[in-house]
Amino acid sequence: PGSGVAIVVDGGYQNAKTIEYAGNNQAFIAWVDYREGANANIYCQRLDVGMNGLFQENGLPIANTTNQETKPRATFVNNETSFITWKQGSTDSKIFYQFVDDDGLVFDVERPISDYDSTQALSRVKRNSTGEVFVKWTDYRDEPTNGDQYFQKIDVNGDRQWGNGIKVDSDNSRDFGARFSGGDEGDLNVVWERGTFPEIEIMYQNIQSDGSY
């Protein structure tokens, strides 16, 4: 057996990694990096089939500010482009995203998943067959205690398609535990849990390509 390939050997603590196919038989890896001490940042690396890193040694910084940047989630878009999202901040946190190709960062600055001024956390991502990316997060704009599950669609150019996000459940009950899969026509299929124990139901919704349902 092999001994493995070091993705990062710089000082500090690294965790919360994510790995996805990146096109051209490459892999995209991102992680939370504490090389600057208590300040958490997001770094990434691409590996070719020979397990060679294609970015700079110890990784390319994606989010490197004085804020805490954690919870990276990645997926493949198309060609050699990857999508990554993460949480910025601790209390009043926000969700941001970026495209990364084989040359590095695609956007000059990271993009917010929503312009609505609310606390955002707990993102998940999936792509569909055409490379559109769907992002789920917990948003506290209407429910400050438990939050609600919101969704955003990002097209292959990196532009948001669903405004400030689509709230999947308009009921006043608690909603949580969403799992989702992109459809063939730009739509999204979502299942989630509604209610509180012991009265919990499994719900389903199809969000159409334009964000309606």
Which residues does each predicted region cover?
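Extracellular, repeat-based ectodomains that mediate carbohydrate processing or recognition
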Residues: P1-Y213
